[in-house]
Amino acid sequence: MRRLIIIASLFMNLCLPMGTQASNGGNVSPDPNFQIYLCFGQSNMEGNAAIEDIDRTGVNPRFVAMYAVDDEKAGWKKGQWHTAVPPQARPDTGLTPVDYFGRKMVDNLPDSIKVGTITVAVGGASIDLFDKRTCKAYLKKQPDWMKNFASQYNGNPYARLIELAKIAQKQGVIKGILLHQGETNN
């Protein structure tokens, strides 16, 4: 039940009508052919599996991911789209279900459809980390390693997901949420 409330909360925060402002000051509608999926959760969503060479090749350019963190060494800039070559969550993570979700989507959708994903995940974290009401209190009680991962999202993974979703919404349409939550909330 708590998961449903959190997912509903995400949708309510994101479903406000938002057009983008063109340089000429006019409204530009988001591209209805750009489908965006918000992805969050624990270690498997973060990318716990090893990335092999085959995972880095053949990614259709219609499958893109938005960087959720800045990483100068890896060349990542938060809020920018890139072809969805793994890793998705952070530069030091692995293969996620998102990698093949996006590939399957573009393989089975018309060529006019582009798929974008935004992944914000922290292994071992409770769903409380993605609840705006409990995130800060939950994180205070966690070990330093988890705080370090969360710090890459400015200490609030929920807020980062919402921030990036609002950026993405200016270009496309949020079509769904992928949540992979496991051992901490079973």
State each model region's role.
Residues 7-15:
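Bacterial N-terminal signal peptides
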Residues 23-186:
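Cell-envelope and extracellular/periplasmic
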